[in-house]
């Protein structure tokens, strides 16, 4: 049996599933949902309709892109790899807020089952896609909704935190939503489902920015400009493989979010009154910042805000960019010196 599995390149390994597959999935997410979001946002802000259309198609391929990228990491044969596109679409759609996590779990099973039967029959072109797709879609129907429901429980903690005083609410919402953004679940979907706007939305934006900008800046030594942009306006989920290897690298941006959250709520009174989904997007395509600005404009039109002040702009820039960068970088320095963060712990394969 061991020899058969070895021949099929099926290796039951925490590294292969928890690091290689997870890291590849994050790249698939970037190459579809996140780049699509950036393209769509550019189109909306510049009034170029074709870019909005292009971005929409890119975002629509999210599940397929993640699944295929996982298949590449698992070294799947061609027919298995191509079949995973359908599996990813099913898992992502049925997984809801836990879509990326559902894609990861389901795709691993579907890929390994597909590899088991690959080249074992004379009608391989039928058997291999049939097994891969059936296993993946049936698993998606059975477990993806449960994974989505589990991911949505994060919303319960967020809603509890929103009922606290602004200081503690700022800390908890910022930290929880920021962590959700980096995990293979959808912070944007959670925020949209909770209609998270207002002061709590501002705290959520702060937490997401702390993760994205924090990782981008503290890993600049390893990843240079490519990593700065990929994480800073893309996603901090790219670091999940490295986080599994060394969870300590998550401390600087998470601590930064615990600081910027209450500053956003108590000092700058930063509110996100745009579309709720923007609360969970952070600096991805600058959607979070555009959401805050849109909220200001809407509030002025509704008569609940007199004007956009210099304090508003200062708060937005400090909370979303400057403070996360400075705090994460400063916290990471002693951690590097004491060996908690080692050389290349933050390195990305870009």
Region annotations inferred by a language model:
Residues 1-350:
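Pore-lining transmembrane helices
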């Amino acid at each position: 049996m061991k020899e058969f599995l070895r021949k099929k390149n099926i290796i039951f390994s925490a590294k292969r599933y928890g690091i290689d597959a997870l890291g590849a999935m994050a790249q698939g997410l970037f190459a579809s949902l996140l780049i699509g979001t950036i393209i769509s946002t550019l189109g909306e802000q510049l009034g170029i309709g074709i870019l909005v259309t292009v971005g929409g198609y890119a975002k629509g391929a999210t599940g397929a892109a993640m699944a295929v990228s996982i298949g590449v990491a698992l070294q799947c044969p061609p027919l298995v790899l191509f079949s995973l596109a359908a599996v990813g679409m099913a898992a992502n759609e049925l997984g809801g807020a836990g879509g990326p996590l559902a894609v990861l779990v389901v795709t691993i099973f579907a890929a390994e089952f597909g590899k088991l039967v690959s080249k074992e029959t004379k009608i391989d072109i039928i058997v291999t896609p049939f097994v891969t797709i059936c296993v993946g879609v049936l698993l998606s129907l059975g477990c993806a909704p449960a994974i989505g429901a589990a991911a949505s429980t994060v919303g319960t903690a967020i809603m509890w935190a929103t009922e606290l005083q602004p200081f503690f609410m700022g800390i908890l919402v910022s930290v929880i939503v920021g962590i959700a953004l980096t995990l293979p679940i959808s912070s944007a979907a959670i925020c949209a489902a909770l209609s998270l706007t207002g002061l709590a939305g501002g705290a959520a934006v702060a937490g997401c920015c702390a993760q994205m900008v924090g990782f981008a800046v503290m890993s600049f030594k390893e990843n240079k400009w490519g990593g700065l942009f990929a994480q800073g306006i893309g996603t901090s989920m790219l670091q999940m493989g490295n986080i599994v290897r060394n969870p300590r690298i998550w401390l600087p941006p998470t601590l930064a979010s615990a600081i910027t959250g209450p500053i956003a709520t108590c000092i700058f009174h930063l509110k996100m009154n745009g579309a709720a989904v923007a609360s969970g997007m952070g600096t991805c395509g600058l959607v979070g910042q555009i959401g805050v600005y849109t909220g200001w404009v809407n509030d002025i039109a509704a008569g609940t805000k007199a004007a956009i002040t210099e304090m508003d702009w200062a708060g937005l820039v400090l909370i979303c960019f400057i403070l996360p960068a400075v705090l994460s970088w400063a916290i990471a320095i002693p951690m590097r010196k004491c060996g908690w963060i080692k050389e290349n712990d933050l390195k990305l394969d870009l």
